[in-house]
Amino acid sequence: MSVGCPEPEPLHSLPCCGPGAAPVPGAGVPLLTEDMQALTLRTLAASDVTKHYELVRELGKGTYGKVDLVAYKGTGTKMALKFVNKSKTKLKNFLREVSITNSLSSSPFIIKVFDVVFETEECYVFAQEYAPAGDLFDIIPPQVGLPEDTVKRCVQQLGLALDFMHSRQLVHRDIKPENVLLFDRECRRVKLADFGMTRRVGCRVKRVSGTIPYTAPEVCQAGRADGFAVDTGVDVWAFGVLIFCVLTGNFPWEAASGADAFFEEFVRWQRGRLPGLPSQWRRFTEPALRMFQRLLALEPERRGPAKEVFRFLKHELTSELRRRPSHRARKPPGDRLPGPLRLEAPGPLKRTVLTESGSGSRPSPPSVGPVVPVPVPVPVPVPEAGLAPPAPPGRTDGRADKSKGQVVLATAIEICV
């Protein structure tokens, strides 16, 4: 069976909106990756691509590929075309990502894909919705964080996205603000994206190359030879770190390992061996601290499900200290761990990607959001009634408020001390 038939069909049969076919959103019907690997992609020359798709602008570019905002000339439908370099990925991994994304597209909190799947001489290509407001990382004011009402709207929708994934025994494995796409800058509508590292629960994978602050401690400690079995707990941990970041504009640590003094201090607090709170956690209320204790439990089996955050969102999460930007030099006396690591925070962290060692898999290139598919409009998800009042008008970081695609260079988020 060939991907790229001329008539539009639901994505579960994997056609491609090639010449003459109007793009339609995927039907959200799962197709086993094993079945997809038997398919052959339709090959399009560069002239075929420009014949049917008008380039609006480039949205992002990275090691693994690029993302272009295009308009389908037949209908004017805008979409994000993701070009993945063949030299950086295997066909089965590309098809796995498309299949998984489509199988989850029935959730209003997960990015949708169009029935556009093809290859060029150098790239594999698929199309997804376009998110005009970029990603969550882009709007977090460093060392300040987002307004709590905005955070609660975002967390509510991400919790529903993760609960939907986990109920289907799928683990995202790369939860971070860069993979949360926005349709407005007040987070009234957000969607989870980038499923290049997603695997089924219980699947054994090799250790990822490198770590980022969202990586769970059991993943950091996994041996390169043995790897580890995928579990929803890694998403729950990353979700907890993400919530800390959006509330504070800082990372809690650089890596969840014993070599990181900030993480070690957190471990001592979690185990009841530290009198008082670590300085960077003092801004949170008691309900928020209980939430973090559950999401960031050191043992994976003790972490609550992602949807457990909902019961904490009815409470205030931060105290008045939340409104004060953190400064490295302002550390309470006697609140440091011994040694030089506690005296200076690491440098600013920029956008990071993870890959699986020796597996040939890769994360998605910079992802960009979805648009209203044709002819069926995408329904706007509405957070739970009464959860969060409307956000105050305007941006909170002093920059001009203008919708745009994802930015490749990151706004720095620093360690809070």
Swiss-Prot record:
This is Serine/threonine-protein kinase SBK1. InterPro entries: Kinase-like_dom_sf, Prot_kinase_dom, Ser/Thr_kinase_AS, Ser/Thr_kinase_Sbk1. Pfam families: Pkinase (PF00069). Belongs to the protein kinase superfamily. Ser/Thr protein kinase family. Residues 53-318 form the Protein kinase domain. It comes from Rattus norvegicus. It comes from the Eukaryota. Its EC number is 2.7.11.1. Residues 363-382 have a biased composition (Pro residues). ATP binds at residues 59-67, 82.
